UniProtKB/Swiss-Prot annotation:
Dimer of dimers. It comes from Brucella suis (strain ATCC 23445 / NCTC 10510). InterPro entries: Ald_DH/histidinol_DH (IPR016161), Ald_DH_C (IPR016163), Ald_DH_CS_CYS (IPR016160), Ald_DH_CS_GLU (IPR029510), Ald_DH_N (IPR016162), Aldehyde_DH_dom (IPR015590), BADH (IPR011264). This is Betaine aldehyde dehydrogenase. Its cofactor is K(+). Involved in the biosynthesis of the osmoprotectant glycine betaine. Catalyzes the irreversible oxidation of betaine aldehyde to the corresponding acid. The gene is betB. Binds 2 potassium ions per subunit. The modification Cysteine sulfenic acid (-SOH) is found at C283. SUPFAM superfamilies: ALDH-like.
Amino acid sequence: MKAQPKASHFIGGAFVEDKAGKPPPVIYPATDEEIASLYSATPGIIEAAYAAALKAQGEWAALKPVERGRILRRTAEILREKNRKLSKLETLDTGKALQETLVADAASAADALEFFGGIISGFNGEFVELGGSFAYTRREALGICVGIGAWNYPIQIAAWKSAPALAMGNAFIFKPSENTPLSALALAEAYKEAGLPDGLFNVVQGYGDVGAALVNHRLTAKVSLTGSVPTGRRIMAQAGEQLKHVTMELGGKSPLIVFDDADLESAIGGAMLGNFYSTGQVCSNGTRVFVHKNIRERFIERLVERTRKIRIGDPFDEATQMGPLISAAQRDKVLSYIKKGKAEGATLACGGGVPKLQGFDKGFFIEPTVFADVTDTMTIAREEIFGPVMSVLEFSDEDEVIARANDSEFGLAAGVFTADLSRGHHVIGQIKAGTCWINAYNLTPVEVPFGGYKQSGIGRENGIAALAHYSQIKTVYVEMGKVDSPY
């Protein structure tokens, strides 16, 4: 099973190779089989990407916004036309079940391109009347923007970052995770097919040193990262030394609160989506599930029953509901957290082991895991695990659960399940998190902003807000009379 691209990098509208770079192997997580071999970007590759971006950006920014938007919308159409092919590529690259990638990856990328391509012509500055004279503002491109992606949603992240950047008239250089380098190249081909001028979307592969080179490059105007909090701190410090714009979409340990009047099946479904989708490798997951004491036993009993029915196996079988984790290292990390949870006194309600799957004995699979009797101070309730491990905590009243939910360095997301919408709005209003749901979880339409509070990030992806993060404001004062000067 191979998925070797034409070359490692895409620069100036063409595939480019330089075999002097360190070769990161591309592994299919379900079998531990190498499916492609790419080369990390050398300094020459990086400089070529900036030269191509610099050459193209000025003319692109000068185009009418509606013309830029037309190309983005055409790219969205191409992604939808090729959705099954792209979804299979994403499944190979990530190990995620095809059942998921068909609806959540290239499809979401297309949604972002269509959205930003449609609204950019209406994203304008302000006019201010000043008693005869007036002022106006212009939204202008930043220049060359850099995106650094994560391995859980490769093509989605590449589009979520590049679509608003390109819509605003910027050029874009994207570095995928070294674990999942393939689909960003497919997105580059789609942009090319749609008519995007050469040099505006470039892909360079590599490890953290390549990302650091992009962040520190003198021509980089903005950096957008999806990654861990430690990586975000490091990149933000580097960018801050040169006062570069940043968007940081980082980790979380989000609370999901279930009151005793909630629809039990919906709440359980939301908790499962918020812990087991993409094998738990979602930054916004609601991994601290607070359940009211009156329904705790019923909730856990039904949760365990439904969790044990999750189908784990061949990611290309569309009946499969959960694939493997991204790597052996990630599987071992998750297993270490499960071990720690048991050692600290949490009750293992189900899962916790490595399933035996015929034909996939070398894959990085793990059982969906539920812990009960979890307390706020346990490691599994404090640290981001990034795997299918749910912690169920009991609470008694509203004020208590709000305080406990907020007792975290993270603030990416939160959810509330209740039949009382007034209470739902009140609780969400008190939660310190940037992306919240009432009677739902982990739904992320591109029309609304996505991002976090506290250590979970700065700036926003998606929604009209994203355009503001890829632009700068110019204020112009126009005097309609003579200059009144005391000199």
